[in-house]
Curated annotation (Swiss-Prot):
UniProt-listed GO biological process terms: maturation of LSU-rRNA
Sequence segments annotated as region (Disordered): 1-34
Keywords attached to this entry: Cytoplasm, Ribonucleoprotein, Ribosomal protein
Name of the protein this chain belongs to: Large ribosomal subunit protein eL8A
PROSITE patterns, per database record: RIBOSOMAL_L7AE
Example of a GO MF term: RNA binding
Any one Pfam family match given in the protein's UniProt record, by short name: Ribosomal_L7Ae
Domain of life: Eukaryota
Native source organism of the sequence: Candida albicans (strain SC5314 / ATCC MYA-2876) (Yeast)
Any GO CC annotation of this UniProt entry: cytosolic large ribosomal subunit
Family note: Belongs to the eukaryotic ribosomal protein eL8 family.
Length: 260
C-alpha cells in the first residue's frame, strides 16, 4: 500500500491556541430584562412624565400655542423686543429718574412741613422732581398730549389687550416707543412688582444728548419699521415631529412623481 504523504507545515506558521476562558461556577449569568414588571429600569430623564403644577402647564401650553398658531401682526410685534445693549442703555438712563421711595417721600414732606412752619413755601425746599411716569392710564394721557419723550412697553403683559394699542397710538402721535422684555423689570424701575409701561416726559440738561441718541436708535427699530411690521404675521412654527412627518410626505410624493 502506498504510504500517506503529509504536507509540510508552512514556514513561520504560528499555531493558533484555542482560548479557553475558565468560568467560575459560583457566579451565574443573570441577563436583565427591562420588560414591564421585570428588572428595575435604568436611571433616565423622566421629567417629561412629571405632572407639573397647573400654572407651569398653562405657561408651557401658552408658549407652544404662540409658536404653533398664526399670530396677528398687532400681537406678533411684541415678540420683537429691544436688543440687549440698547435696552441696557435705556434702563441706565431711566434709573437716574426713579420715583421716590416711601422713606424719601416721608423725609421730603417733613422738610416741607418745617419750611411752611418757618413761613417759606414748599417749592423753596424741594423743587419739582423729574421722574419716570408709570401707570397705564397716566402714560396714555401723556402720549395723547404728546408730553412723553420716550415710552417703554413690556412684552409679557397679561392680558395683552391692555397694551396692544399703544404702539399704534405712539406712531400716530409721533412719540418714540420701544418694547422691552419683562414687566417685572419695569416694575423694579418704579418700586412696584410689575409695570406694563413706563415713560419719560423730561430729563436734565446733562442727559439731553444721551436721550436724543437713544431715541434715534429706538426709532430706527420701531417707528421707522412700523408699516413693515404691520404686514408680518407671527407663529406657524411647527415641532420636530410635525416637520418630520411633512418631510416624509413630501419625499413620498416626490418618489411617486419620479416613478410615474
Amino acid at each position: 500500500m502506498p504510504s500517506s504523504k503529509k504536507v509540510a507545515p508552512a514556514p513561520l506558521a504560528t499555531k493558533s491556541k484555542a482560548s479557553t476562558s475558565t468560568k467560575n461556577p459560583l457566579f451565574e449569568s443573570t441577563p436583565k430584562n427591562f420588560g414591564i414588571g421585570q428588572s428595575i429600569q435604568p436611571k433616565r430623564n423622566l421629567s417629561r412624565f412629571v405632572k407639573w403644577p397647573e400654572y407651569v402647564r398653562l405657561q408651557r401650553q401658552k408658549k407652544i400655542l404662540s409658536l404653533r398658531l398664526k399670530v396677528p401682526p398687532s400681537i406678533a410685534q411684541f415678540s420683537q423686543t429691544l436688543d440687549k445693549n440698547t435696552a441696557a442703555q435705556a434702563f441706565k438712563l431711566l434709573n437716574k429718574y426713579r420715583p421716590e421711595t416711601s422713606a424719601e417721600k416721608k423725609e421730603r414732606l417733613t422738610k416741607e412741613a418745617a419750611a411752611i412752619a418757618e413761613g417759606k413755601t414748599a417749592k423753596d425746599v424741594s423743587p419739582k422732581p423729574v421722574v419716570v411716569k408709570y401707570g397705564l392710564n397716566h402714560v396714555v394721557s401723556l402720549i395723547e398730549n404728546k408730553k412723553a419723550k420716550l415710552v417703554l412697553i413690556a412684552n409679557d403683559v397679561d392680558p395683552i389687550e391692555l397694551v396692544v394699542f399703544l404702539p399704534a397710538l405712539c406712531k400716530k402721535m409721533g412719540v418714540p416707543y420701544a418694547i422691552v422684555k419683562g414687566k417685572a423689570r419695569l416694575g423694579t424701575l418704579v418700586h412696584k412688582k410689575t409695570s406694563a409701561v413706563a415713560a419719560l416726559t423730561e430729563v436734565n440738561s446733562a442727559d439731553e444728548a444721551e436721550l436724543s441718541k437713544l431715541v434715534s436708535t429706538i426709532n430706527a427699530n420701531y417707528i421707522e419699521k412700523y408699516e413693515e411690521n404691520r404686514k408680518h404675521w407671527g407663529g406657524g412654527i411647527m415641532g420636530s415631529k410635525a416637520n418630520d412627518k411633512i418631510a416624509k410626505k413630501a419625499k413620498a410624493a416626490a418618489a411617486a412623481v419620479s416613478t410615474a
